[in-house]
Amino acid sequence: MVDDETLSVAQKIECLLRLAVKSSREEMTLIRLYHEMSSIGNQNLMYKLPRSMELFTAERYVKMLEEGQKKGEVRPELDARLAAFSMDNIFLSLQFAYACDYYRIRFQLYNHPEIDKEEYDEKVISETFQILKGALLVPDMSERD
């Protein structure tokens, strides 16, 4: 979806948010495993893991935002690499909030005890989408979608 040139950056971001929430429910064990693998103290694994697991995604997010800047969709003053990193951190935090106990508790404390239930997914997606649109997209473009 990130490489789909028929979609606007706003549409791609919304699709990615939906995927983050859906995959957190469907692949909870994998999300937890990723969290465990990325937070252990094994130095060799720490240096290999981000490169092997994150490079593919990082390159696509940066490309998506840079192309969006060229098309006038993404704020031109942003560093696309730092913006991609920040956007991915939001996606990652959402995934952990649904799959990992500590992050779920934080999610609930900031919101309410049932925020991680499926009935609230649209609210979570919509609100997070508004935050990302405001941070990343040119105002006229973010109002379009």
What are the functions of these language-model segments?
Residues 1-5, 31-38, 98-105:
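Secondary-structure edge/capping motif, primarily at the C-terminal ends of alpha-helices
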Residues 1-30, 80-87:
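Hydrophobic alpha-helical connector segments
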Residues 13, 31-34, 46, 85, ...:
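Gram-positive cell-envelope targeting signals
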Residues 14, 47-51, 126-127:
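Short alpha-helical transmembrane interface motifs in multi-pass membrane proteins
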Residues 21, 25-62, 73, 82-84, ...:
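Short secondary-structure transition hinges
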Residues 22, 55, 59, 63-71, ...:
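C-terminal peripheral helix-coil segments that are non-catalytic and often amphipathic
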Residues 32-34, 47, 77, 107, ...:
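Short, hydrophobic secondary-structure boundary micro-motifs
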